[in-house]
């Protein structure tokens, strides 16, 4: 099938959150499975620093009375065509923000639709989050191009209302409306990034005022679990960590622990449990819970803590102040750095992710891949990816708690600290976590079923596709 991915983020070229990881990795697996997959994204001002882009465009067009040009390159280290939407509106070195954000992404979406109509015509356009939400609306009347719309985070629906009401070209049913709601209504199929989140967003607690629409259209909604790029996130070959290792050589992992302690200014202590957090420092990620229990946990245990990320200023300030109270035991790095995050996964003993809500979450998958045991609140994709640790039956992959309460989070962390002292059992837990299959292969098969369905084919994999997916999965393991 011919599939065009359209998104505001594509890792490793432009990434703010998990959507970039998905759009940067899922096309690779679909390509391996024999599909003609291409990617369409804005030509941000920093893209030319990362890949070679020809000076001459492959196509020029017009959208919203503006001229634009499309340049072709390739996703790094692949043969997957990458189309870059060029216009001065995207020349800055930022992805999001600014008063013109709604206009920029409406223009980008319109340009992607024009490109699909007039240059490279796919069978399916796979749209990602609100930035591309107008594409299903415009494509709804197109008989030979279907759309799939993926909700990565329902909380971010786009600053659209005032803008759309001023656009005379906007369809009548969009006047004063929510563009994500329109995408949900007009896409041929809607997906989200985990089965549990697909159920949760049909309830008032998680539906962000769209639960009625999502519940009404639940037959058109499917949750497909995200995966990670297991070639990039591979502790046996990762050039960004101090010492490579795998599930059968965990004795080498302690060198990464010592290295991350040195790098972040912690005391060198291989016996202290190192807790890692790599996250946006916002309420969604449970940072308020962390702040409430941190003094008590650090006083009760001899653990160390590394926090990596940026976010709300008041959280950054509080965490920075708390770090000063625990010199040598707590490090706060207020930045986004993929290489450093991998060193945290490779060196920390546990990974704390107490999210208020979590559509899927990728950090816990990356952590497990590196033998870093997750402590999670059971919500969204965290339910689908982390199972309760049972040392008696030697089952499970992490520590979980249900209620969004400080005491519950504290208790789970103390249980992990106590379990960490039993080294033989802990190593078995690490091996189970590292060997869990969070590659894209099975999930890619579920997307293929969705793609077949929207073009009128039976939603099932052929024996050849089943065999290929099984072969790729076996090679990963």
Curated annotation (Swiss-Prot):
The keyword Cell division does not apply. GO terms for biological process: glycogen biosynthetic process. It comes from the Bacteria. It is an enzyme of class 2 (transferase). It catalyses: [(1->4)-alpha-D-glucosyl](n) + ADP-alpha-D-glucose = [(1->4)-alpha-D-glucosyl](n+1) + ADP + H(+). Pathway: Glycan biosynthesis; glycogen biosynthesis. ADP-alpha-D-glucose binds at residue 15. Keywords: Glycogen biosynthesis, Glycosyltransferase, Transferase. CDD domains: GT5_Glycogen_synthase_DULL1-like. Its EC number is 2.4.1.21. One of its GO terms (molecular function) is alpha-1,4-glucan glucosyltransferase (ADP-glucose donor) activity. PANTHER family: ALPHA AMYLASE DOMAIN-CONTAINING PROTEIN, GRANULE-BOUND STARCH SYNTHASE 1, CHLOROPLASTIC/AMYLOPLASTIC. Belongs to the glycosyltransferase 1 family. Bacterial/plant glycogen synthase subfamily. Synthesizes alpha-1,4-glucan chains using ADP-glucose. This is Glycogen synthase 1. It comes from Synechocystis sp. (strain ATCC 27184 / PCC 6803 / Kazusa).
